[in-house]
């Protein structure tokens, strides 16, 4: 049995079993060598127990698979959390800006790692994040927000990349139209300022939207001027109503499907002949779409007949003075503002705006109106002045409101009326009226209402250190010194006794020699009763004194019980005209209507109004 090799052929298999292809053998004759080395058939010799056998390919395969899986995970982390430094070194500022989401650089995607970087992955990620600048990523805008697709979208993105998009647009206008934008338009600082005419430069508008806008803008504008040149479009729009830059921008954004970044909106130069000629000549070009009648500022500067009339037009200061006198304006700011608003309808106002000496003419106009008004006032008696003033009061009131208020203060109305009659006539030692009493009893309200209807002047003791503080009394028919205190009474007792007597006094006025005048009727209100102090005894005969004892009453809704208005004083003077011994207006020919109004211009009396 030991000499026989193999197995018994009687049991199923009588031949040697030979496998033609070995599964895990690298040698061709492994089987022969196995049998040749062991002449004995001992099955235990098939295994070598003398030394350890090394692990086969399974461990190496597992290690390779784990290595590849780890490398893939590391590469995914690198692509997710940081970008390559090489791109940042080229332009760190460009790398920190991104208009739309973009893919990270993949240059390290297939690099093999040595193993050292894998072992220090956490430290490397920390260093890379600290060294990588923050990126500013702007989400990609939708096509509707970009104001067009394709080429228009690219133009919009080009503007977004510019540091100064406005300078970019201005350069494009100069490049495509051959003229600077601000040679045709003037600049408004505020977006709220309104104007009827606007010059608009639009960048990157789709051509089909420009064509549709020609019809849509006709609903809003009286004149439309459109010139398309490449990616730029120039508009001159004369709207039916004045609009602000914000309103114009929103309108064009909805019609042209653009962003505000793509528009420049400014009002045109209305007094530039060169600018007017550009719009006029451009409307004759076949590439320009123009619809509607020319605006007036273009016609006046381009048409021959209008130009000749404009050249012949000269500014007449007397017309401006007459207008200010008729409007009863003496303040320079009011005259300047209101007269400038008339430039659209008045040729003289338009000529004044075009003049280089506007300020000088304005100052002279206001000064002349004050001279005329002062001369007119001095020429009138007190009766004429009162009648002149109440004729300018509109509406009707009731004189009993004033009578009720005087009786409410426990004052005999007959005594008050007699003192008031002598007061307005300016009789010597009777031309000063004092109303004193506790606070909130209506002293100032009563005095101010009378001063307003008679257009008097107020003097304030706060200016007493100036020698000019009495000068307003030379320009009025009635004066008021409100809330006189003890220092004020000391000043009056020391320096103004002769003025209260009705004598001529010298009053110093600024930029003039001292004037010789008589004080007009002077009304004084005070919380101080001079009769309570004997040191003012010399003023007793010069001042008529009345006391208001009760606080002024108000209704539950806060309105005053007694209506001391211009209409009430108008009714008071008309009702008590005879009792106040005022002269009849008919005797002075003041209300007959045949007397011609004051005229300070050289125009023909029978000329057109």
Curated annotation (Swiss-Prot):
For the region Disordered, give the residue spans: 37-67
Residues that hold ATP according to the record: 437-444
Q: Which GO terms describe its biological process?
A: DNA replication
Report the residues modified as Phosphoserine: 83, 91
In terms of HAMAP family, this protein maps to: PPV_E1 (MF_04000)
Report the family membership: Belongs to the papillomaviridae E1 protein family.
Quaternary structure, per UniProt, is: Can form hexamers. Interacts with E2 protein; this interaction increases E1 DNA binding specificity. Interacts with host DNA polymerase subunit POLA2. Interacts with host single stranded DNA-binding protein RPA1. Interacts with host TOP1; this interaction stimulates the enzymatic activity of TOP1.
Name it.
Answer: Replication protein E1
Provenance organism? Human papillomavirus type 49
The taxonomy runs:
Viruses, Monodnaviria, Shotokuvirae, Cossaviricota, Papovaviricetes
């Amino acid at each position: 049995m030991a000499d026989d090799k193999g197995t018994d052929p009687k049991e199923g298999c009588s031949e040697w079993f030979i496998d033609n292809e070995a599964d895990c053998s690298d040698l061709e004759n492994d089987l022969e060598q196995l049998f040749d080395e062991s002449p004995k058939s001992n099955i235990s010799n098939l295994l070598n127990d003398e030394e350890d056998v090394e692990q086969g390919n399974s461990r190496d395969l597992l290690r390779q698979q784990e290595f590849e899986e780890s490398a893939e995970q590391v590469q995914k982390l690198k692509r997710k959390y940081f970008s390559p430094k090489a791109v940042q070194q080229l332009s760190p500022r460009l790398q920190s800006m991104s208009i739309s989401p973009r893919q990270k650089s993949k240059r390290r995607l297939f690099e093999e790692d040595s193993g050292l970087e894998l072992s220090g992955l956490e430290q490397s990620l920390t260093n890379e994040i600290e060294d990588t600048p923050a990126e500013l990523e702007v989400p990609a805008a939708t096509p509707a927000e970009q104001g067009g697709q394709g080429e228009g979208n690219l133009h919009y993105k080009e503007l977004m990349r510019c540091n100064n998009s406005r300078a970019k647009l201005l350069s494009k206008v100069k490049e495509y139209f051959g003229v600077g934008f601000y040679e045709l338009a003037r600049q408004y600082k505020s977006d709220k300022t309104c104007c009827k005419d606007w010059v608009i430069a639009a960048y990157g508008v789709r051509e089909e939207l420009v064509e549709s806008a020609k019809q849509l803008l006709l609903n809003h504008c009286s004149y439309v001027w459109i010139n398309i040149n490449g990616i730029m479009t120039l508009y001159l729009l004369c709207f039916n109503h004045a609009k602000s830059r914000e309103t114009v921008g929103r309108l064009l954004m909805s019609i042209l499907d653009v962003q505000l970044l793509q528009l420049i909106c400014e009002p045109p130069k209305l007094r530039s002949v060169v600018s007017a000629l550009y719009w006029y000549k451009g409307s004759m070009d076949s590439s320009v779409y123009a619809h509607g009648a020319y605006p007036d500022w273009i016609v006046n500067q381009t048409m021959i007949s209008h130009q000749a009339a404009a050249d012949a037009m000269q500014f007449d200061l007397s017309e401006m003075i007459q207008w200010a006198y008729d409007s009863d304006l003496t303040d320079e700011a009011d005259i300047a503002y209101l007269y400038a608003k008339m430039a659209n309808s008045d040729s003289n106002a338009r000529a004044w705006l075009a003049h280089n000496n506007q300020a000088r003419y304005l100052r002279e106009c206001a000064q002349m109106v004050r001279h005329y008004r002062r001369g007119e006032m001095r020429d009138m008696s007190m009766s004429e002045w009162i009648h002149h003033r109440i004729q300018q009061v509109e509406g009707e009131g009731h004189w009993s409101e004033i009578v009720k208020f005087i009786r409410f203060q426990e004052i005999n109305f007959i005594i008050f009326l007699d003192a008031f009659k002598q007061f307005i006539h300016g009789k010597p030692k009777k031309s000063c009226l004092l109303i004193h009493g506790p606070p909130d009893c209506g002293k100032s309200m009563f005095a101010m209402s009378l001063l307003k209807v008679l257009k008097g002047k107020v003097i304030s003791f706060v200016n007493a250190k100036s020698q000019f503080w009495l000068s307003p009394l030379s320009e009025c028919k009635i004066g008021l010194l409100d809330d006189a205190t003890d220092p004020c009474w000391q000043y009056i007792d020391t320096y103004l006794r002769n003025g209260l007597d009705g004598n001529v006094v010298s009053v110093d006025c600024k930029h003039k020699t001292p004037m010789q005048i008589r004080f007009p009727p002077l009304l004084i209100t005070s919380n101080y009763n001079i009769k309570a102090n004997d040191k003012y005894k010399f003023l007793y005969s010069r001042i008529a004194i009345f006391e208001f004892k009760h606080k002024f009453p108000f209704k539950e809704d806060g309105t005053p019980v007694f209506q001391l208005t211009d209409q009430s004083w108008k009714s008071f003077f008309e009702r008590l005209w005879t009792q106040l011994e005022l002269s009849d207006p008919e005797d002075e020919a003041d209300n007959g209507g045949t007397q011609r109004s004051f005229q300070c211009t050289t125009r023909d009396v029978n000329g057109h109004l």
